[in-house]
């Protein structure tokens, strides 16, 4: 194989060029591979190869590049050394050959040149379609913006009016001054600007969306803004702000030059920080050791000084990439597996020719068609699908055009059949080795269920000619002549290796317009211009596809007619009339203050009812609140359906998991629907696959299946036995407002397109019925389409993907989107990534940015996880990060959590610690098998599905970090205690403060808190910190960090964790100033702390950031840090202790005294405590050998014999980590250290190990959390026998 490398060198040498090879190791130490990329100047292609050794990886990369040169006619195939793989001859045709004869062969990867390719001369060998940009650059003229960018250096922090975290980026235009400037602009340009308002959410949680599009004649294009606010005024202000900021970045208007008159929020009293002398000395010493210069005390207190140090270490700026990149594509090749993105270096396929592969696969298929009776029966079923009549037309269009759109009604069979038409056509025409098809689906359940269906139709199990790949689960098909179904997100992650070895990309459900699909369409549009031989098939429901057709150069559209059976649809007034429904009397229960509705000035369409309906119907309809989902009416419809005596499943569309769960419980409580005659199944993306699968299973005769689903069942998945659809006409969307970092989950009206899709789900087996729970008048007012997700979500993650795939500038790339996002959102994303050190001075990915781009999590959490690895608490940080992707695991009857859930927080006053404790306890419980896991979740009222999904996500995050080179030791699972001192947990909370910044708040009284700049908010009712009643609460520290701000009628903070002021100074602040007496954090928190101490802590943050820079360049150094960095980490551990700031967490243990005593725990096996012997929550009660006798330090205390610090956490060796390894009794309990090799260590060999065999150890006698007798945590689960307490 080495010959091909020399061949490429020689070929380049003749042209005075040198191929440039870049090799990197991928995978972890145990199964390391080498990835090689080769580039040649002047060619917009990257050759790629990989192997278990560097030499073969280089040869494979050279081979890939040489095959590319053959495809573009720079080389003849017979000139290439023939070892290994010869490029497939049919696909090696000249890409510029326009002869009709070549194009006439179905599926030939040449074909006549489409008109758009005449534009390619401008694109410099197809670099991403800049020639076509004017048509689609609908957003902003980014060239002007980027050319002036250097002059307008951004100001990171600013003092602005309403909470505005980033006005300095946008010419200091804020909520307060933008609307007036927009009006001036309208007057000057004689524009009639009108806001279009939409109301979202129910009355008690109502908010508004304002949107506007304006034409800017100076630059000859339109700009668009769509923003959200809790009332019309705020929504309009936010919309005006987005428009003005875009005008500023386009150079149409000036920056704001007036003073931003600070609208004073509530002031926070100065907080006295009690710092010990010892810690101050320690801080000064470490700062000296690190050679950090701290800012001296200001001479004049009226002129405060900034304490923040600049960056101490920066990533070397990498070379700027070509202005426009394109994802590399190559046709299928014999020794390349496209599904694993790796070369096949071993086995028969490594040396098989394309002709051999094609012949073998054709023979296999022909034999199967002749011999398999079941397959013949399935083929007859397939013949009946409407799409079958269009097979030859579809194949002809795909053969002749790089892009084809197929539009077909729900259930016509396009999703399952089109990929099979292409595959079978290739196999039967001896071109099997040239065919690999990837099909994207918007959701995991659709990818898996469609793959399983296609495998069944082919008489196979998944993994042969058909497979799937979704997050957490893959069954990959064979490397040639196969179909892979995957989610769009999975395909985007695969693009890093290019679209290599794939002949056809099919994008299903393009009308959904999620951010990933829109992103993929931009990538594919560029790919198809650079590589016209690739085939792109876009599939959509029966909606207007003209926008997609125009976007893809007026490509052909094939219309597939024929839904199986007609569906009769009814609206709210019809439903009320046919069921004689009378709404129950309204609940007079007083609403909580923050849930109060206000004046509703949006028309109530339930008051509009045609004359053809009776008076009773009109009265009943007027009594129903449009914004709420009427459960009683759904019940009435279910009873009505029963009277029709037409068997079939009922599919009920509801917005969001909460309503599905509540509706399921509501129906199950009803003796009629809770009986064996009904099977009620939830369907939601967050429930496990095995639960999701149940909806496809047939039910016995006489049983009615009721499926309660979100819009997941709207597209792709087809549940064959559905005859009835009850449609709430709503859906839940996440709205994000960048200028104040506010998230809002709003229930909004679905679009007409959504309703059409939902209706189509009925009528698969017989004529169907669809009941829309909105009035005809409301239906007329619905939007035709939903707003694209790209307009209502932060763009940080997509921006990282653009850089990872080398697609050029973030803004320039997004300007090519089918509907580009507003320019101000793009600039926000770039700024955030620069601040995180993910982008360097040339706006290219840094080593840190490269890792963040690979983590499927918010970039800030990604950096927090890397810091967690440095402190050896990576596992806990991964758990918390994973948990943020899913709903809380608590099943709560009311809005507030009960004691059974609050107790998981121990005395840490933290929702995040509660999540960590729940996860830890569940992980322990499931060691006893599935039954123990189920019992534990039922007893603790926890959602087992959520916990399992969190585990999957955590494992995935850890694997990515390990594959990036982080040592496995820094990601080992640890046990935390939430009721006593635990320095590792202190560090986790410090890092969490970094991860959720700028979400910091200060507790005032009861539920009231102040957020950034002293704005009022409330503690969210689902928090462990939410008081039970109006009684006031005192917390050990008034400072909290929180996960997100949720806008209901008031603003509330969700996911709260108590922190100390030192943790804020260290990790949750951007601007720290001192006047010598007081320290001001982010312009609103005032701390009484010595200037020197504050300056030292702030300097440590800079030193920590510098360490992150070094670690991300070479993650392996974590296990061998130099002594100075070790001491710095130890100092940060000290600062993270609550006691370092004079805070005693023990004070608050009776904070829940305004309610009943916590219930006693039920027995599990022996004993009765939740954790080991005794009768209460903490083994022997809070008094007996728990907290009391022996206490933290003495015998029989908290940590087992010898107590928490007898023999000690630090005992034995000289540094922090020394205690893990040795010393008389560390965390591991009696004798032996955390990982001591004798007597009861964490993984001790003799006196009881991790799962102690012979008494003791982590869960054995005298183990981590218990003094005396046998049975530690599991008391017998893993110790000897099942004695002495435990579950």
From Swiss-Prot:
Residues bearing PTM N6-methyllysine: 143
Domain Helicase C-terminal: 633-806
Subcellular locations according to the entry: Nucleus; Nucleus, Nucleoplasm; Nucleus, Nucleolus; Cytoplasm
Annotated region (NTD region), positions in chain: 1147-1276
Stretch list, region siRNA-binding: 5-9, 53-55, 179-183, 231-233
Residue(s) carrying Phosphoserine: 125, 318, 446, 503
Asymmetric dimethylarginine sites (modified residues): 1163, 1235, 1251, 1259, 1266, 1282
N6-acetyllysine, modified sites: 143, 188, 196, 1021
Domain DRBM: start-end pairs: 3-71, 177-249
Stated name of the protein: ATP-dependent RNA helicase A
Region (Necessary for interaction with RNA polymerase II holoenzyme): 252-661
Region named Interaction with BRCA1: 227-322
Boundaries of every Helicase ATP-binding domain copy: 395-561
Protein encoded by which gene: DHX9
Annotated positions of the Omega-N-methylarginine modification: 1172
GO CC annotations on file: actin cytoskeleton; centrosome; CRD-mediated mRNA stability complex; cytoplasm; cytoplasmic ribonucleoprotein granule; nuclear body; nuclear stress granule; nucleolus
Renumbered residue ranges of the record's region HA2: 828-916
Motif DEIH box: where in chain: 508-511
Species this chain originates from: Bos taurus (Bovine)
Family, similarity comment: Belongs to the DEAD box helicase family. DEAH subfamily.
Residues where Mn(2+) binds: 415, 509
Superkingdom of this protein's organism: Eukaryota
Residue segments, region Interaction with CREBBP: 1-247
Principal location: nucleus
Domain notes: DRBM domains cooperate for the binding to nucleic acid but not for unwinding helicase activity. The helicase-associated domain-2 (HA2) region is essential for the duplex RNA unwinding helicase activity. The minimal transactivation region (MTAD) mediates interaction with the RNA polymerase II holoenzyme and stimulates transcriptional activation in a CREB-dependent manner. The oligonucleotide- or oligosaccharide-binding (OB-fold) and the repeated arginine and glycine-glycine (RGG) regions are dispensable for both RNA-binding and unwinding helicase activities.
Stretch list, region OB-fold: 955-1071
